[in-house]
Amino acid sequence: MAQKYFGTDGIRGKANVFPMTPDFAMKVGMAVGVLFRSQRQSRRVVIGKDTRLSGYMLENALVSGFTAAGMEAFLLGPVPTPAVAMLCRSLRADLGVMISASHNPFYDNGIKLFGPDGFKLSDEIEKKIEQLIDTDLSKSLASCAEIGYAKRVEGDIYRYIEYAKRTLPRDVRLDALRIVVDCANGAAYKAAPRALWELGAEVFAINDAPNGTNINQKCGSTDLASLKQKVHEVRADVGIALDGDGDRVLIVDEKAQTVDGDQLIAVIAEHWHKTGRLQGNGVVTTIMSNLGLERFLNRKGLELVRTNVGDRYVVDAMRQKGYNIGGEASGHIVLSDFGTTGDGLVAALQILACMQESQSSMSHLCKRFEPVPQILKNVTIKNKNVLKKNQVKTAIDQATQRLGNEARLVIRASGTEPVIRIMGEGDEREVLDAVVAEMVDVIAHHDALSKVGASLEGS
């Protein structure tokens, strides 16, 4: 059953529009605070945010809710999402909160929740929180003497920087490397350039001047144009693109060519397999990862396990299988030797370590496999249940049969936007084009019929 407020990556929406309003955020703080206060000991919550203007509003609202429930709030300020997960553990907090909409534009925002172990909360706990949100909590709040307090914590970003630096093998330095890092005007604008510089690299930071509205604006992992231009301009060895909250990374090689998350996973998995660091003889990715990655890993005798989209599902599968590498083509890369969630900076450091240890260029290192042709289309919809219609289901089944066993068709509703994502993948491009175009028309047609039906019912 779909959850009421939580999507694939927490609660998300447009700032000052439900559910990203201050009154609702305060209710979330109350509900989460009441639940965790009753189960835990420290009653401590750490709260981080990215650089969106609305972060201030939501931070204050959440603090009001948490303190009303008797929780002590430690405010980290702008930090990457993985820093919240890491500091949640090191500060012995019961809960971690990240205020961010990740790679989305500045006008969106969201609330991500982490448990005391640094892992994102389970669906079961999120459902309990939703039930509490819809409950009158006035009798469950703290007494006057037990109201919590809020404290702004200074300097913890440097704890995260040191943590990230320690993930690099001791005998590896970045001396003489020219690195461009695109901070997306986001949460990693301090941490990423500083860590790379302290490790010896010559660093060129771009999009590192957030103003509240320029996060992810023609920059970062969703728009590599400015990074490619800078890599070419300064003749860099590598370009690193992070997203707004620092949990994704894409790479641009010295030829200004894009390296996506699938290729990065292949590089790390192959290197760790050779050096005996790969656990469980496999890797976890999502249904959106390229078939070429699966074929590459299979040739190495490694298994590829696919999950639904969302790094939380990747992490769940990694824990179940005992694997220490997982990720998504979009650049979420989870390395459980180091952390509990996607970490763009740490993943980039592991790629740089592979590059230094192999003494090869980034373009050579990151060409591990030839991607299978893949087409991705988004259909904006009004009816989120359009995929449940029998006619649509039948059309999807027929299209899947038409593609055959050596190709894939993945159609899913986005967990963060009102769109249906259609991905076709296979060796025969013409067939793919036809099938994907057909499915775009089918879904758009039946969504339009839903709108007509709804208007007739309301007339």
UniProtKB/Swiss-Prot annotation:
Domain of life, per lineage: Bacteria
Coiled-coil annotated residue ranges, if any: none
Pfam families: PGM_PMM_I (PF02878), PGM_PMM_II (PF02879), PGM_PMM_III (PF02880), PGM_PMM_IV (PF00408)
Post-translational events: Activated by phosphorylation.
Residues engaged in binding Mg(2+): S102, D243, D245, D247
Extent of the signal sequence: none
GO biological process: carbohydrate metabolic process; peptidoglycan biosynthetic process; UDP-N-acetylglucosamine biosynthetic process
Modified residues (Phosphoserine): S102
Purpose: Catalyzes the conversion of glucosamine-6-phosphate to glucosamine-1-phosphate.
Family under the similarity heading: Belongs to the phosphohexose mutase family.
Name the record gives this protein: Phosphoglucosamine mutase
Species name: Bartonella quintana (strain Toulouse) (Rochalimaea quintana)
Gene: glmM
